[in-house]
Structure formats: C-alpha cells, structure tokens
C-alpha cells in the first residue's frame, strides 16, 4: 500500500526552503491544496522527554504541476525547486515511502539520523522484518553490539539511521507500519 499518490498532472519533487521556514511553506501549500510531505522524526531529549523534529531541515516534498507554479512563485521562502517529470517520479515516491516507514518506526524507538559519506556500492538489502526492502550495512557500535545502518540518498546527501540488531530481526507483524 502506497501512502503517496502518483498524479497525472503533477510530479513529486523536493523544495529547499530559506532558513528554517519549512513549516511555514508546508502550511502555505496545504492552504492551496497542493500535496506536500514534511517528515518528522522523534528525538529523545532525556529519560522522560522526547520531541518531534523535522527529519530533513530546509527540505519539503511537494507534488506540483504547471498550474501550481504561479502559487509557488508567490512564496518567498522557497530557494530551489527540484522536480522530476510527470509520471516519472517513482524514485522519489519510493524514497518517500522509506522515509515514511522510518518516521513511523521512530515513534517506538530512538534512532539517530546522521549525515555520512557512505559507499553506496557495498549496501545490502533486507528481505524480512520491519525494515524489509531497505538498503544499508552492518557496523559494530562502541558498546560492542551490531547495528544495521539504513542509508538514504536525498538530493545527493547521504543519511544513515542506526537500528539495533534485535530490532532488525523482529517479526514484521509486531510493528504496524
């Protein structure tokens, strides 16, 4: 089941906002009924406190077409637009699905998101569990436990999210994603 639609008159793309105005741009597009997605991730601050932060600061996924360009030009908080061709945005939709799954998984655990320069050729693909279909690599953490780091490539920037070995091998049915 896909959470993001592929439109016939719009294509999904990425928008870079100025400063930290992605929340404003999200509400601006929502007001004009332009589909957009602003991913959040849960971050544990202390033992009893956690907050939801924007996963990719200054970036926002938006589906726009020719009819929406005039509306976008009126928003002064947009610095760049990166759009794919209409009906050729499967790669972006696939990335958004992975990001959505990670966003849902962050509600049950604290998974650090870091920028990296990982080598994409050495990645393995998981075939079962809650991270099924995601690509990454195994590493040994400082406390001696194995972690699986999921690698995401968003506009040429590589991100890694670390998951514990026990989480990777959990049954898929136990986690509703």
Please tell me what each predicted stretch does.
Residues 1-123, 139, 143, 149-177:
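Acidic-enriched and Gly/Ser
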Residues 126-135:
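Short coil-to-beta-strand transition motifs
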């Amino acid at each position: 089941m896909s959470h993001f639609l592929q439109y016939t008159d719009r294509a999904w793309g990425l928008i870079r906002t100025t400063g930290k105005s992605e929340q404003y741009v999200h509400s601006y597009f929502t007001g004009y009924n332009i589909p957009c997605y602003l991913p959040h991730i849960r971050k544990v601050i202390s033992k009893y406190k956690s907050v939801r932060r924007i996963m990719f600061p200054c970036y926002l996924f938006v589906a726009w077409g020719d009819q929406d360009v005039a509306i976008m030009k009126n928003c002064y908080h947009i610095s760049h637009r990166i759009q794919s061709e209409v009906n050729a945005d499967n790669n972006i939709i696939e990335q958004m699905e992975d990001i959505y799954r990670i966003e849902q998984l962050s509600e049950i655990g604290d998974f650090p998101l870091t920028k990296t320069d990982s080598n994409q050729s050495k990645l393995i693909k998981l075939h079962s569990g809650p991270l099924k279909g995601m690509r990454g690599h195994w590493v040994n953490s400082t406390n001696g436990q194995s972690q699986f780091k999921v690698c995401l490539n968003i506009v040429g920037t590589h991100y890694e999210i670390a998951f514990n070995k026990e989480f990777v091998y959990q049954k898929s049915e136990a986690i509703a994603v």
